[in-house]
Amino acid sequence: MASKKSYLDSLRKVSLFSSCSTKDLEKISKAGDEVSLPAGSLVIDQGQTGREAFIIISGTATVRRNGKKVATLSSGAVVGELSLLDHGPRTASVTTDSDCVMLVISQRQFLAVIDAIPALSHKLLATLAGRIRELDRQYFG
């Protein structure tokens, strides 16, 4: 595991957490477990029930929907949060392209962090709205 300072700096780069205080970043860090995944690991399987969200600390991953590549993600990306909010199935698959370090946060811990840091709710809504707009632009032009 990286030093506490560099780990918190990595979390600060996550768009969702960019306005969080150091104290809030420490809460987020404590809410999850760090995992190291080799290249080629299936992180999220489309259609499966989501039980956790993943924050990419280092490395890259590809998002595929129905087998079609829709995005490449890197440090600072959060994936899997949608299923945690609506208890629905995963909407895409995510596979690591390189060795990755991720913070894994369970549904219970994810919701507790949102409750403990109210500003995250607004930021999360803005992030999801941005994704909807991007999909709308891609689909309708």
Would you name each region that the model predicts?
Residues 1-141:
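Cytosolic regulatory regions built on CNB/CRP/Popeye-like sensor folds
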